[in-house]
Amino acid sequence: MKTGVYAGSFDPITKGHQDIIERALKIVDKLIVVVMNNPKKNYWFNLEERKNLISKIFESSENIKVDEHAGLLVDFMAKNSCGILIKGLRDVKDFSEEMTYSFANKKLSNGEVDTIFIPTSEKYTYVSSTFVKELAFYNQSLAGYVDDKVIVDILNRAKEYRDRG
C-alpha cells in the first residue's frame, strides 16, 4: 500500500486543496493530510479547527487521514513510514519554491522522500486561502472556492474579524 503525505496550513482548506487531495488519491492508496503551522503566517483558525474543517469535508473517505505536525515534515514522514510527498502547484512561483524544498527534503531524509508535483486544475489557479479569507471578510459568496460543508464556519469566523473592527 502506497501512502502519501499532503501538508499545508489549510487556513482554510479551499477547493484547490480539495482538488489536489482527490487527484493524489489516484496516485497513492492512502493520503495523510498534515496540518502544519507556518511561523510566518497569522491564522484565522487554530490547528484543531483547521483539522476539523478538513475532516468535515472528507468524513466519508476511508483512505484519508487528517493529522498535525510541528517541526520538519521529513521527521513526520519518517515516523509514519511515508516516502511520497504530494505538492500542488498553481504557477511557476510555486514550482520554483517547491522544487527547492523538494531537494532539501530529499537530502534531509537521506533520499527517502520523493516529491510528486500535481499542477492545480485551471479553474483553481487563482484560489488561495488568503483569497478566500478576503472574500469572506467582505461577506462575498464562497461558492466554488470552498466546500459547501465549511462555508458557514468560514463566514462565521470572518464575521468575528469584522466585528473586532
PLM region spans:
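Nucleotidyltransferase catalytic core that binds NTPs
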Residues: 1-165
